[in-house]
């Protein structure tokens, strides 16, 4: 029996500056409000209608620190996380909230460079802040994230590993083919 999949992908705009706090163990937690909008034409009136949905996002660990440092109100961001519901009691009443959690398996990617008014404006670019182990690069870009012309950087936080006294095995670079004339220049597209 399948265990199920809990994965949320959002591309949206920060509605306010992120709120960063630190747990007693020193880990960062960042909360932010992310707006996503969709637009369509009403068939009856012919007018454009826009609906904005607000999402609560909680980030943990290194990605939370980075979000607190670089995200501001109006920043566009790509988020990969999971849907999670919390329960607590306040004044004898049970309360619930559902939020998107970005933890060790989640990803945050800044889109569109720095927001206007930033002192270091013009450096542009974005970063892919991913706390999980590096994933193999794909030969084609993902279709769910908007394309950027600015360079991107990956910041990966790998889980701590035990140090080994043996040197890591060296991989040999692939050798180029010796006979370049054997390639067919007629590409079928």
Swiss-Prot record:
Organism, scientific name: Pseudomonas syringae pv. tomato (strain ATCC BAA-871 / DC3000)
Function: Plays an important role in DNA replication, recombination and repair. Binds to ssDNA and to an array of partner proteins to recruit them to their sites of action during DNA metabolism.
GO cellular component: nucleoid
GO molecular function: single-stranded DNA binding
Residue span, SSB domain: 5-109
GO BP: any one term: DNA replication
Renumbered residue ranges of the record's region Disordered: 110-189
NCBIfam families named in the record: PRK05733.1, ssb
Composition bias type Low complexity, residue spans: 112-121, 130-179
Protein keywords: DNA damage, DNA recombination, DNA repair, DNA replication, DNA-binding
CDD domains to which the protein is assigned, alphabetical: SSB_OBF (cd04496)
Lineage, top ranks: Bacteria, Pseudomonadati, Pseudomonadota, Gammaproteobacteria, Pseudomonadales
Name of the molecule in the record: Single-stranded DNA-binding protein
Keyword Endoplasmic reticulum: no
Pfam families named among the record's database cross-references: SSB (PF00436)
UniProt short sequence motif Important for interaction with partner proteins, positions renumbered to this chain: 184-189
Quaternary structure and partners: Homotetramer.
């Amino acid at each position: 029996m399948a265990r199920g999949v809990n994965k949320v992908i959002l591309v949206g705009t920060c509605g306010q500056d992120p709120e960063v706090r630190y747990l007693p163990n020193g880990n960062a937690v960042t909360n932010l409000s992310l707006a996503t909008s969709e637009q369509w034409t009403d068939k009856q009136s012919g007018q454009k209608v826009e609906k904005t949905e607000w999402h609560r996002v909680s980030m943990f660990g290194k990605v939370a620190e980075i979000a607190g440092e670089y995200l501001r109100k109006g920043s566009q961001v790509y988020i990969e996380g999971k849907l999670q519901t919390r329960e607590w009691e306040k004044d004898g009443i049970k309360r619930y909230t559902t939020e998107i959690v970005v933890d060790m398996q989640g990803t945050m990617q800044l889109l569109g460079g720095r927001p206007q008014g930033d002192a270091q404006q013009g450096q542009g670019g974005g970063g892919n802040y991913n706390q999980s182990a590096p994933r193999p690069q794909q030969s084609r870009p993902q279709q769910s994230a908007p394309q950027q012309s600015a360079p991107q950087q990956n910041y990966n936080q790998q889980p701590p590993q035990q140090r080994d006294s043996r040197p890591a095995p060296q991989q040999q670079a692939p050798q180029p083919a010796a006979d370049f004339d054997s390639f067919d220049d007629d590409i079928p597209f």
